[in-house]
């Protein structure tokens, strides 16, 4: 079914840990496309520091030239909150017969019951959970029950059905976080080797994470 990986986030800023996770999942799960969706107004997180259009530009620069990496600006263009269920509904309408795989990290998965209309997500897409090696999935509560009901260890299920499965995959964990990158830049330090050079240059040229913006 030519699965599409959907990788949303604030990307404030995007860095090599994001890109490595996307690349490993693309290779391991045989995803023809990883679509990055920078959030415009994320309802479940603190407001981003950098402007939405600037973060979009960062993602475009970071993914340029990588086969199968694409960027979708629909959430940036929205005036209101960017709910994942709404974005997936739009994508499902556009790709009625395609397998959609929503990529989330471990922390996001554990907070899933707090998401808007979270039980509807699996009606629209598969859920791919990227986690640290050695992490154990919850065995109790709503997420434990959901994993018993919807969990799969078969990559083929992501290709043979449009939605409804949860697949958990261990990825290399680079110890980089957007918060730490912003703090480092705010202290006047160089973020070289934490992100692609084109993203670094844009950040330094715009001073979007200068000390006055992070305190």
Region roles according to the model:
Residues 1-215:
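Nucleotidyltransferase catalytic core that binds NTPs
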């Amino acid at each position: 079914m030519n699965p599409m990986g959907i990788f949303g986030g604030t990307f404030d800023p995007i860095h090599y840990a994001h890109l490595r996770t996307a690349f490993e999942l693309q290779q391991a799960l045989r995803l023809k496309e990883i679509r990055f969706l920078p959030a415009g107004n994320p309802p479940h997180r603190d407001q981003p520091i950098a402007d939405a259009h600037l973060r979009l530009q960062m993602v475009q620069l970071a993914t340029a030239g990588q086969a199968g990496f694409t960027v979708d600006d629909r959430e940036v263009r929205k005036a209101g909150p960017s709910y994942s269920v709404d974005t997936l509904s739009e994508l499902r309408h556009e790709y009625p017969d395609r397998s959609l795989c929503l990529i989330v990290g471990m922390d996001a998965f554990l907070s899933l019951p707090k998401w808007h209309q979270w039980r509807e997500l699996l009606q629209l897409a598969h859920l791919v959970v990227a986690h640290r090696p050695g992490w154990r999935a919850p065995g109790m509560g709503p997420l434990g029950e959901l994993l018993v009901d919807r969990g799969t260890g078969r990559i083929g299920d992501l290709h043979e059905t449009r939605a409804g499965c949860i697949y958990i995959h261990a990825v290399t964990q680079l110890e980089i976080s957007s918060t730490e990158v912003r703090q480092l830049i705010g202290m006047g330090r160089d973020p070289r080797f934490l992100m692609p050079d084109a993203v670094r240059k844009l950040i330094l040229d715009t001073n979007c994470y200068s000390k006055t913006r992070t305190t």
